[in-house]
Amino acid sequence: MLGDGNEGMSTIPGLNQIQFEGFCRFIDQGLTEELSKFPKIEDTDQEIEFQLFMERYQLVEPLRKERDAVYESLTYSSEFYVSAGLIWKTSRDMQEQTILIGNIPLMNSLGTSIVKGIYRIVINQILQSPGIYYRSELDHNEISVYTGTIISDWGGRSELEIDRKARIWARVSRKQKISILVLSSAMGSNLKEILDNVFYPEIFLSFLKDKERKKIGSKENAILEFYQQFACVGGDPVFSESLCKELQTKFFQQRCELGRIGRRNMNRRLNLDIPQNNTFLLPRDILAAADHLIEQKFGMGTLDDMNHLKNKRIRSVADLLQDQLGLALVRLEDEVRETICGPIRHKWRTTPHPQNLVTSTPLTTTYESFFGSHPLSQVLDQTNPLTQIVHGRKWSYLDPGGLTGRTASFRIRDIHPSHYGRICPIDTSEGINVGLIGSLAIHAKIGHWGSLESPFYEISERSTGVQMLYLSPGRDEYYTVAAGNSLALNQDIQEEEVVPARYRQEFLTIAWEQVHFRSILPFQYFSIGASLIPFIEHNDANRALMSSNMQRQAVPLSRPEKCIVGTGLERQVALDSGALAIAEREGKIVSTDTEKILFSGNGDTLSIPLVMYQSSNKNTCMHQKPQVQRGKCIKKGQILADGAATVGGELALGKNVLVAYMPWEGYNSEDAVLISERLVYEDIYTSFHIRKYEIQTAGTERITNEIPHLEAHLLRNLDKNGIVMLGSWVETGAILVGKLTPEVVKESPANRLVYDIVGIQVSTSKDTCLKLPIGGRGRVIDVRWIQKRGDNDNPETIRIYISQKREIKVGDKVAGRHGNKGIISKILPRQDMPYLQDGRPVDMVFNPLGVPSRMNVGQIFECSLGLAGGLLDRHYRIVPFDERYEQEASRKLVFSELYEASKQTTNPWVFEPEYPGKSRIFDGRSGNPFEQPILIGKPYILKLIHQVDDKIHGRSVGNYTHITQQPLRGRAKGGGQRVGEMEVWALEGFGVAHILQEMLTYKSDHIRARQKIPGTTMIGGTIPNPEDAPESFRVLVRELRSLALELNHFLVSEKNFQINRKEA
């Protein structure tokens, strides 16, 4: 895939494969497993029995298409039918019927679900795998304390600990612990069975005293003792069935259910052979765990690494959907039981059918609630195609049953050797969740037991062929695995003596004959985002992390351009993202236009609809452009249309622009960027953004273009229905939808007189029009008037879509692919920009001080190689870690290409041996050359979604908080500028007393002074100085009064300096 020279390399699997496999596993296995748990339901008289037959169920093809579901804000789902039976025991008759129990949201070709018209995706969660784990900690006396933690399938934890006297305790809470003999007896074992099933019975007998022997004399005594400790109940409780039931519900069901994975882990760790279908904790498990704990105490066992991936499990979309189905079936069971056992059954006049007992509400509402509110169900990030595909490969330690950002330790966040080839060590979030949210490696997949697996090539002397195996984290630590960037991986130099390899979480240097497996790709252990960074091996990991995140923030441009220097993954990322239109079979193009492509094949004519100016969840523009011509024959899999941020079927997030690394009058200090006006006038970095504005009408509200008290020019864009016309240009404050809401009118003599004379009831309406908010301007490209089917009382929804064209401007954020980011500080005329020796002015000027301290030298290689590629009209696809072929391979490649470009273009300044990669350039203002040679090149620069149009904000008059009377905070609320301590110090330092007084009084919380300003300003008078305390000070006084503290304050008069007492 990546070139003929990369022999033995594997093609990369579908990047959406994890989501697809999870959903298919839910359909194939999860539905059957949950239906098999549905019990038979009988009425109170045991005359009627209801049951579901798990063998016969079906999912019906959706009634509507994906596009219609998005357009109408509905759920793209399939009806779930199950065969059910209603048995009358007295007559032995059974009515069997296929019933509808609800709708299940389906997964589309992008690996996402459409719920209420919104694309949503379920991310993977990493949890501690159920089983038992042994660890050692030091107590306050610096003595090692050994514990064994049993984790249930639901996340509940119980601990076994051994003290100095080798007594073993089971801790059921933080404060309460009981003897392991009492726990085993409460679970049904007597003393003889306990001693027969342990390896060290003498240790168990050593702490068995008379009092302890009485507690385990019978199962009832053990249960009473256990209940007294577990429930913290005083006195002498009496044994009863209700006590056993409560103990079963609160302890054994929550903390002792191991599940399928937990039973497998428990058998492996404790060397047991308990059947897999026995998923609950048994006395045999407890006793075996105690034996291993004794061995740990005396140094005969090995402790567990809780952060090793073999001790983790992946909770994928299949597990989450199956859990929700189980929850919905429990609710359905309660509903059916209430119907059968309720008083309404005596009123049945005819024989009921199974469908009469079941409604689709429990299943449908459960899934809609899950997709709408569960933390692991997120709105799909559609900023660009890369973002969409990376979002489905995310994993998280957080959310239900997991960790929190404030309590997670550094050890959990850190990189672990078992992450090799499974979890990307680079790509993670920044901030408080660093190390807790990340991306899967490019080849990782989820195994049958919920573990992350990675592929490796097996090296065997018996077979000459290459065999690829997927290894789980527990298996590969028993083998030596050679790294993918090793020199000895090339077949020509396999006689190297030693190679770097990994064995048992250690990185060693061993002989090639001792290697069992080797990696299949050099970037196998990176995520998609990190694999798109060229020369990543020359960058610091922190900057690579930033680049992985910033590539997902790149805005699709109106004229995209594929990168000169890439890694080779750009085509597959674009293909798997769903942004392209692909031919599903061979045929011939009949016609093409902006809306659809018609092509004929096998006697049929197919129509492929194209995406036209569709708004994404991030307000970016999604649009497809045909790439085939009429009459052209196409093959299966050929690209028919490019999407947003794709060119020729490859990912294209930015532009190749001419860049110089030099200081320029201080305008590019501190990561600021200087750009040429060419980028503005030639629409180099112009992007389109589509915003959605909507309004609902219900009841007596009406949409109209006749709005009283509004001037005609404000309604000029409305049609006869009161909705803005397509193609209209609208500015801030423009009316998009005219709407009137009736108000209740108080009865008055004047209104009664009008009614008596004219016979018309006086009514008033309130103006509730939809207006374009601050910052909104553009062209109306779509209007949708939607009403839900089947009910006229449902509120109507009107959506207005406005397209906004944004050129690059001062305040926008740009970034490269190496973590080199900056804000546009100044736009210079092209004649003032520094220019090359051939007269071309540069497009951007970066600060050279941003390279050495941040150690992202990869941008220098990309910059120089891009210059050579631009002159030679070549595109390069560089696989990371190219030094595995030759030392200094990156430097040699760049210099050789620059030398060839210099020869072919007859421009010796392209490659000058004295300072290769640099050139003498000239100041555009004076024409004089700069003193030092300057690095110039053509890197790939992205325009990010952090744009000044979304951030800039101004306020003159707005809302205030009720308590402190200070302006609100934030742009969304129309808030004011915040002035804190440091801002006050800065103003004090410059001695601007009047500005400081305005900030703290008139513009803040001084109510009386604030009210005098408008009138004083209109008549041109002098604004009086405030003479009383501001409102925040009054709040402080009232707070102190609530604590029974009286605070009196005094104001000094400027005229006579006499002290006057003022009450707050």
From Swiss-Prot:
A Pfam family assignment: RNA_pol_Rpb2_7
InterPro entries membership: DNA-dir_RNA_pol_bsu_ext_1_sf (IPR042107), DNA-dir_RNA_pol_su2 (IPR015712), DNA-dir_RNAP_su2_dom (IPR007120), DNA-dir_RNAP_su2_hyb_sf (IPR037033), RNA_pol_bsu_bac (IPR010243), RNA_pol_bsu_CS (IPR007121), RNA_pol_Rpb2_2 (IPR007642), RNA_pol_Rpb2_2_sf (IPR037034)
Top-level taxon in the UniProt lineage: Eukaryota
PROSITE patterns linked: RNA_POL_BETA
Record GO cellular component, one term: chloroplast
Example GO biological process: DNA-templated transcription
Entry keyword set: Chloroplast, DNA-directed RNA polymerase, Nucleotidyltransferase, Plastid, Transcription, Transferase
SUPFAM superfamilies linked: beta and beta-prime subunits of DNA dependent RNA-polymerase
Principal localisation: plastid
Catalysed reactions, as listed in the record: RNA(n) + a ribonucleoside 5'-triphosphate = RNA(n+1) + diphosphate
Compartments, as annotated in UniProt: Plastid, Chloroplast
GO molecular function: DNA binding; DNA-directed RNA polymerase activity; ribonucleoside binding
Enzyme Commission number, as recorded: 2.7.7.6
Gene3D superfamilies: 2.40.50.100, 2.40.50.150, 3.90.1100.10, DNA-directed RNA polymerase, beta subunit, external 1 domain, DNA-directed RNA polymerase, subunit 2, domain 6, RNA polymerase alpha subunit dimerisation domain, RNA polymerase Rpb2, domain 2
Family: Belongs to the RNA polymerase beta chain family.
Subunit structure: In plastids the minimal PEP RNA polymerase catalytic core is composed of four subunits: alpha, beta, beta', and beta''. When a (nuclear-encoded) sigma factor is associated with the core the holoenzyme is formed, which can initiate transcription.
Function: DNA-dependent RNA polymerase catalyzes the transcription of DNA into RNA using the four ribonucleoside triphosphates as substrates.
HAMAP family named in the record: RNApol_bact_RpoB (MF_01321)
Protein name as catalogued: DNA-directed RNA polymerase subunit beta
Source species: Jasminum nudiflorum
